[in-house]
A protein has these predicted regions:
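Mobile-element integrase/transposase regions
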Residues: 1-50, 58, 71-76, 83
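A structural signal for short, well-ordered beta-strand segments and their strand-loop junctions
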Residues: 24-25, 91, 119-120
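Short, flexible loop/turn elements at secondary-structure junctions
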Residues: 27-30, 52-56, 64-68, 94-96, ...
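Short helix/loop capping segments that flank catalytic or ligand/cofactor-binding pockets
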Residues: 33-35, 60, 100-101, 121
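A short, structure-level motif marking secondary-structure boundaries and short turns
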Residues: 39, 62, 91-94
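Acyl-donor binding region in acyl/amide transferases
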Residues: 45, 67-106, 110
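Coil-to-beta-strand transition motifs
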Residues: 54-60, 85, 90
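Globin-like tetrapyrrole-binding proteins
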Residues: 96, 100, 104-177
Length: 177
């Protein structure tokens, strides 16, 4: 599995010769914070999807959604294309949001119609996308820590317990009118 692969040797890619906008790498990550769900109003943790340029490590696109799905991925890619042009290749994992027909289908898929190649990583091998995995460990946490409802690493457990109690109480009060 992936734990064993961490012990094995690996080949580090040389991204220094990669042209800008040649390879984009994308992945979604759950935010370690709670906010109000726009449909039912209960507290939930939103999903953020980042797309970065492989050569420069610059975040070219992002999307915030209710869950990691094809619309979140497409939104992040759209944001990137709108602001930075079209990549030659979009590299991602094999998640359902990344490999849906809306993105990949030969004739009607967004990526083939734009002429963007879409290879995916080996299932269970996040090391192949280490650049985006590293970003997902740091950037969403820095964003989420700015909110009182942050529940990730380093959050005060007692404060978190009280905050969750207050959130549940507020939701109940809203439902009762």
């Amino acid at each position: 599995g992936s734990e064993y692969r961490q012990l094995e040797g690996f080949t580090r890619r040389d991204w220094s010769r990669m042209p800008v906008n040649y390879v984009w790498i994308g992945d979604g990550h759950g935010m370690k914070m709670k906010c109000r769900h726009p449909v039912h109003g209960r507290p939930f943790a939103p999903e953020v999807t980042f797309v970065i340029d492989g050569g420069t490590r610059f975040v070219v696109g992002w999307s915030l959604d209710l869950a990691e799905n094809v619309f979140a991925v497409a939104g992040a890619i759209q944001h990137g294309i709108r602001h930075h042009g079209k990549p030659f290749l979009y590299y991602s994992d094999n998640g359902s949001g990344e490999t849906a027909d809306i993105l990949d289908k030969e004739v009607v898929g967004i990526l083939p119609r734009l002429g963007i190649n879409h290879p995916t990583g080996i299932a269970g091998n996040p090391q192949g996308r280490g650049i985006i995995e590293r970003l997902n460990r740091t950037l969403p946490m820095r964003i989420a820590r700015k909110y009182r409802t942050y529940f990730g690493k380093g959050a005060d457990r007692e404060t978190l317990r009280k905050t969750n109690r207050d959130l549940r109480s507020a939701f109940t009060a809203l439902q009762q009118g």
